[in-house]
Amino acid sequence: MKLAYWMYSGPAHIGTLRVASSFKNVHAIMHAPLGDDYFNVMRSMLQRERDFTPVTASIVDRHVLARGSQEKVVDNITRKDKEDNPDLILLTPTCTSSILQEDLQNFVNQAELDLETDVILADVNHYRVNELQAADRTLEQITRHYIEKAKRQGQLDIQKSEKPTANILGVFTLGFHNQHDCRELKRLLNDLGIEVNEIIPEGAFVESLKNLPKAWFNLIPYREVGLMTAQYLKKEFNMPYISTTPMGIVDTATCVREICKTVASLRLSFGVDTPQKQLKETNISSTKVDLVLKVEENREAKPLNTSMEVLGESKLRFGPLTNFDVEKYIDQQTRFISQAAWFSRSVDCQNLTGKKAIVFGDATHAASMTKILTREMGLYVLCAGTYCKHDADWFREQVQGFCDSVLITDDHTEIGNIIAQYEPDCIFGTQMERHVGKRLDIPCGVISAPVHIQNFPLGYRPFLGYEGINQIADLVYNSFSLGMEEHLLEIFGGHDTKEVISDSLSTETGLEWTSEGLTELNKVPGFVRNKVKRNVEKFAQQQNISKISADVMYAAKEA
């Protein structure tokens, strides 16, 4: 436990509450002191949802310390059951309840005697896991509970759907553009002729968890949450899962190929690979089949329209998706739907070639962004990092060869010092890196949680799929400040004229700039002024000079 000015991953109970509040008609009760109940305010402010946050704090106060928690916790569970009639009440411990060594499982058992509602104690170790790990674990625990419950009641239907279907696991509240990504994933799956079976946990009911085995496969867009659930379903029902994040042109194409390959192999194993059998199941008219055969004869490449001719051929020919169909779809989407492919070859984007960047965020977004910047947009990534220390090995493997160095840390001062040391042209990180960039006057594009309210947009801004590629291209290009444009605006008194600000993370340098020194510094073009200022201050410190004049600037230049 440590006192921190900024945390990338919150305590474990925040992850549990994020999962619980993502489900519909699920109420969470946390046994915590005042101060730990900030989740309600945070979610209400950031998530921009109309519903109230379904979380109640069972406050640990002096009465609890004197008499024990059992009566208060059980009363809170019973009261919420009567008031809200939820499908599930999830009790989450906190660091405080762990310190007090409360037997919360006993409280849950006692409350269940008088209730018909399911009551679960979140099984997370608050001293060993962080917010994201706890969220992953809680989602798996709730899924396991309801699938085993359905097994006991004989209500578990593991019969696969007739048409290819998929579950999307890991979309939940306070995630980075998760709702927008989910819409884009549904569109992508629809293009491939795959229906969505369930989306867990965002907007789902716990009773629908028993339907998860009906799907053909699971799609996990983010490594942080959903992977444990997918592994559980793989172990119990032999359900394949795809964990490649479709972010960027290359990885989106890879994900599409994996999906089509998985569906093709499952079709063969399910025995739906013959035209006669599939024709009988889908009731496609002979007129439609004749139309498709004519389309197949003329396979000229052209932009896809709403009827999806290219994939329509593949689905209506009844066989598994062939590599030719998949590659044609990817080519059409890359050239006509995504604008990033041609934009990356344009003169505007070539201005970014060789620009230096630093990337930091959660493992999924930081790794994907590093690869996009390097191989798709021609930038030079000095350092790629993540605060997901538990996923460090996977992250290193993903970014190997795409950056100069790798940083695994949850200390914001470390990445801040790296940024100040390398002085990149742009930063791509979290809200904290945005603050650092403002202090150092380095532009920053936000690509990962934790973020503030401006990164919970009301408009449609996915980061996944082919539309997400367009959003990323805009973000990258708009994040960079064009040096000559800024310089010209300053020369002609444009709106970007600004005073020299302090650009070191430590403001107590003990140096004083004279008026003539500042005048000389202001003559330096804006896009290199900050670097010149830092170099002069560094020179002055080495020479034990306390006042920086124009002569000191000239001496630093000659040194």
Swiss-Prot record:
Substrate binds at residues 483-484. Its cofactor is [4Fe-4S] cluster. Keywords: 4Fe-4S, ATP-binding, Chlorophyll biosynthesis, Chloroplast, Iron, Iron-sulfur, Metal-binding, Nucleotide-binding, Oxidoreductase, Photosynthesis, Plastid. Pfam families: Oxidored_nitro, PCP_red. Binds 1 [4Fe-4S] cluster per heterodimer. The cluster is bound at the heterodimer interface by residues from both subunits. InterPro entries: ChlB/BchB/BchZ, LI-POR_suB-like_C, Nase/OxRdtase_comp1, P-CP_red_C, Protochl_reductB, Protochlorophyllide_Rdtase. It catalyses: chlorophyllide a + oxidized 2[4Fe-4S]-[ferredoxin] + 2 ADP + 2 phosphate = protochlorophyllide a + reduced 2[4Fe-4S]-[ferredoxin] + 2 ATP + 2 H2O. CDD domains: Pchlide_reductase_B. GO terms for molecular function: 4 iron, 4 sulfur cluster binding; ATP binding; metal ion binding; oxidoreductase activity, acting on iron-sulfur proteins as donors; oxidoreductase activity, acting on the CH-CH group of donors, iron-sulfur protein as acceptor. [4Fe-4S] cluster binds at residue 36. One of its GO terms (biological process) is light-independent chlorophyll biosynthetic process. It is found in: Plastid, Chloroplast. The active site is at residue 348. Pathway: Porphyrin-containing compound metabolism; chlorophyll biosynthesis (light-independent). One of its GO terms (cellular component) is chloroplast. Transmembrane segments: none annotated. Its EC number is 1.3.7.7. Belongs to the ChlB/BchB/BchZ family. Component of the dark-operative protochlorophyllide reductase (DPOR) that uses Mg-ATP and reduced ferredoxin to reduce ring D of protochlorophyllide (Pchlide) to form chlorophyllide a (Chlide). This reaction is light-independent. The NB-protein (ChlN-ChlB) is the catalytic component of the complex. Protochlorophyllide reductase is composed of three subunits; ChlL, ChlN and ChlB. Forms a heterotetramer of two ChlB and two ChlN subunits. This is Light-independent protochlorophyllide reductase subunit B. It comes from Oltmannsiellopsis viridis. The gene is chlB.
